[in-house]
Amino acid sequence: MLALDRVGKTYPNGVHALARFSAEIRQGEIVAIIGGSGCGKSTLLRAIAGLDPASSGSVRLDDIAISAPHEKIGIIFQEPRLLPWLSVADNIGFGLSELPADVRRERVAKALARVGLADKAKAWPRELSGGQAQRVAIARALVPQPEVLLLDEPFSALDAFTRRDLQDHLLDLWADTRPTLILVTHDVDEAVVLADRVLVMRPRPGRLFETISINLARPRDRNSELFDHFKRHVLTSLDRSLDRNVLDAHGRSDEGGAMWW
């Protein structure tokens, strides 16, 4: 269980990025975080990762306080950040040095197959397309089998076809060990196709506005009426999260201790 308890973040320049953000995320759950620009999505993700600890409140994984990077938590950024002097296979196996060589090779080979790059094991990062490089980054993050994997808009720089392809590969890899996935995205379609729950954030400072459960079996049909229903629900919530009148009312209820679930 990942528990976020009234997480807040204020920077030295006085910018109040997050306020009293609380949520509980179950092991193996996929959660998407969505909201308007400047609502603190990436700030929240960095606090969960321990890269930029919260100013107030707490982040706890299995009752362990997280205030610095932790071996049980992995993260994928928008840019793949591959090591250019290592082959694709060595990039994927980079975090497995403590494992026996045969176990390491088996995990890397399985991950390469899962992301459709079995024929690229000996290639160099410079020889890959943007989509291929991000597949390697996903495989590299998942082969150490973290309990939690954080994804900060990992597909936003890719074309629509490649983005959908990588979403499918991500779900294939997730199904092997079922870590908790927390995805920051601006893409409503992506949130609905991947997530068990969507957390909609309100801005300035960032707070939880609404939690939407996506009650759809996988694999999900993007053309179904139910899929469209959940997309409309998320879009409506996003619109309301940016409506000043709604925010004022929501802010008053926050002061009284109410929560939106």
Pin down the residues of each PLM region.
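Conserved signature/switch motifs of ABC ATPase nucleotide-binding domains
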Residues: 123-126, 144
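Short coil-to-helix segment of the ABC ATPase nucleotide-binding domain corresponding to the Q-loop/switch region
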Residues: 86-93
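Conserved ABC ATPase "signature" region
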Residues: 102-120, 172
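Helix-to-loop junction immediately C-terminal to a conserved catalytic motif
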Residues: 49
